[in-house]
Amino acid sequence: MASDFLQTYRNHVGERSVLGIPPLPLSAAQTADVIELLKNPPKGDEAILLELITHRGPAGVDNAAKVKASYLAAVAHGTEKCALISREHAAQLLGTMLGGYNISPMIALLDDLEPSVATQAAAGLKNTLLMFDQFHDVKEKADKGNSYAKSVMQSWANAEWFTSRPEVPESIMLTVFKVAGEINTDDLSPAPDAWSRPDIPLHALAMHKNPRPDQSVESLPEEEGKRGPIKFIDSLKAKGHLVAYVGDVVGTGSSRKSATNSVLWFTGQDIPFVPNKRFGGVCLGTKIAPIFYNTMEDSGALPISWT
């Protein structure tokens, strides 16, 4: 029941906060509950409902993303009314969903008679790369004279999705989390914890859960075999600089993506509008295993190997 959702969700938030991790992303059923509450928001809960639909619903082609995109599309087109989300705001939120179920609605909104709505749809498409065959739908509108579609095509041609991003700084001040010896992916993403890999924040708690030779006392696992040195890593982050993960040999083994997810959970930055996923971070090693290196790069990190 939608009426019971918020209390259940708050209980879930409390349970996860005890572990020091954020709540899970919304499921399709939870997203539907949020939407029902948005249609008639309980007094005092307006802010949390906006937070949930904006930041806690998955992007892409997740089932929950389909529910979210369908509702936002209806609001943006004006077939659904929402006191908390205007048509322009709905179009803007569609543009944060990266690709998947949001693409068709945004392309349709390029024809909207309200300029502010069409402008928001165009802005979202300019920063969306996962278009696949629907690129041709935008091109077709541009060829027929749609000015918003033309602006999207020109933006893609100019690679504004890339050039609009901050430049790589000349220098970066880092705090080092140094781990001696060879670090394999099982140190970062233990096989016995494979069941939790889809839940990145929870799985990351197992990183370095087993002690290593020559390990400093403060970097020992908080609970051997269960929980890694989370407080120690947090103390490094509290210094105010990016934390660089540093090792002698880093990333040997087979679980490259889940291992990367764990490292980036502690050293990276939140991906805007995408719950429980991070990008960025710095990884330094005398030697970084090639596939782990590539996976770090693909995840938006900066791996540097000096051999």
Predicted stretch roles:
Residues A2-I35:
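Amphipathic alpha-helical packing elements
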Residues P42, C82-A83, L113-P115, N146:
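Short inter-helical turns and helix N-cap capping residues of alpha-solenoid HEAT/ARM repeat scaffolds
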Residues E36-D45:
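Short, contiguous, helix-prone interaction/anchoring segments in small proteins
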Residues P22-L24, E46-D62, H77, L84-G99, ...:
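Structural detector for internal amphipathic alpha-helices that build alpha-solenoid repeat scaffolds
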